[in-house]
Amino acid sequence: MSSTLHVSDPGVCWSVADPRDLALRIRLRAVQMVAPQGFGYLGQALSSAEQVAAAFAVARPGVDRLVCSPAHYIIAPFAAAAELGLLDVSGYGQNGSLFEAIGTERSPVVDYTCGSLGQGLSAALGFALADRFRGSDARIFTMVSDGELEEGQVWEAALFAAHHGLGALVVLLDANNSQVDGPVDTITTIEPIAAKWSAFGWHAVDVDGHDVDAVCAALGAAAAERGRPSVLVCRTSTRHGLDCLPPDADGHFIKLTPELARAALSELTAKLEALRA
């Protein structure tokens, strides 16, 4: 296992037999990663697990790219890579580890992540434009959060990508209505999300972000949109898949007591066994 690989590196290899299985394992692994610290960005893995599983299911290893614009979502790609046997993520969140809780320019797995929210889409369209010049047909799967839509740079990038017809660009927009200051819709009105992206010239669809088959199907439809970029507005929850979370738990930054961690691991293990039965 390499600690520095990225999904677009030549020679990297993985396969996903069942993205539903992988989504559950992403959640399970994320709990294992957060448990030693007792807190962390577990909610971001819970809301994006199906999106990341679908991206790994359809992406071509060593060709396509993965960009993680909201750096605190990096836990989900890390968990997926670990479950696919690409990385050993022990030490996640510890001082000196490459597997930092908030992604940096040193982070493996993804081709780009950033500290300041709203910058990732600009980098992704740069990849798409450069790949066009190189004659590459690589797709760029780009994770974006709904809170990032409060940043003007996202909309500048959206305009640019549509103007240049960057059909290789596919945004997985995690619409979980959660950010550090509270529910997104109480801070800034960003709806109707899909209609706004469509008005900018994008192929835009609303998707149940926890239906991995629907996400995979939407990614397949996006592949046919080679003349314009695509965005999947994935409706999700930062609590999805963990019934044991207390009702007042802060989904943006979850406190995971030892008792809650054990309950979460037990619940997810049972769900995985039921899926495989």
Where are these regions (language model features)?
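Thiamine diphosphate
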Residues: 109, 113-116, 121-224
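N-terminal hydrophobic or amphipathic helices/low-complexity stretches enriched
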Residues: 2-26
